[in-house]
Amino acid sequence: MAMLLLAAALWYLFGYPAPPVDLQWRAPAATQIPDDAVTVRFAGTSTMLFSDGETQWMTDGWFTRPRLSQIALGQVAPDPAAIEFGLKRLDAQRLAAVIPLHSHYDHAMDAPLVAERTGALLIGAEATANIGRGLGLAEERMRVVEHGESVQLGAFRVTFLESRHLEYADPDMVDKLITQSEIPAPLVPPASIYDYKLGKAWVLHVAHPKGDFLVIGSAGFVPGLLDGYDVDTLFLGVGALGSQTAEYRADYWQETVGAAHPERVILIHWDSLLAPLNGRLQGEMRIAGLLSGGNERLHEWLRARRAANPQLVFQTLPRFEPSLLFP
């Protein structure tokens, strides 16, 4: 009996609960795409491919899903097969850029290999460049940017705004991944997830003739940062937001959605960091959720935000399929 109970407990802890979003929020996949439309494809977490038919570029480019055992042993590394699979499913051809939203492993670990395979420029903080150097990416294939700097990618103008990362509930993680923010030398994998320091947490403001949008990868904020950046669509990172206080969540909403006045909010970074890339989008593994906390609180809060803002189009994205951002 004891063995059965142990097996049941392990099955539960290492299983995936329902995600903290409602299925009916999912945007439809585009069946017909006008030649000049701007589209987005979502691979999971905050990896997205944007295209206007002329130019493709990507946030994060993270496709590897390290196992818990690899994370525990400090042995995470890019998985070339997963990267090839993800790029193929996204129909990523020749990318203008891959832009990690910060330098943690679940954003930047694969980005240099994505750049190498697609011809993209790797753009980000110095920490991101040191991830690229550790994987042998040539210096001319990387660009280090600072707060307020803009990069032109075809008709897309991307402006980098330095924000803050959400603070984890675990003080040790805060110290190792946020307070110690720099990667001071080329990072050669396999490595610990704690070696993938924050670097800088970017919010991207993207201007295009068809419409403007913001991409917020981490549920952190700087008061007043987004004042004056009104946009049509806001991609809102909500990872681990349920672990924060109700006051923090209210402030986060006000400093993002409240500041930018979007017509549409698209949720990102709500799915599991461990579930297979070739499966459906899942909630975080229960044992990982116990560490980050708040999956149910996040779901309740998102439902409440949607109900309180009926004028907003409130969406998630299908996996890998194109969705119309601006027809």
PLM feature segments, named:
Residues R143-G211, A288, H299-P327:
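Flexible, acidic/histidine-containing loops and adjacent segments that form or flank the divalent-metal
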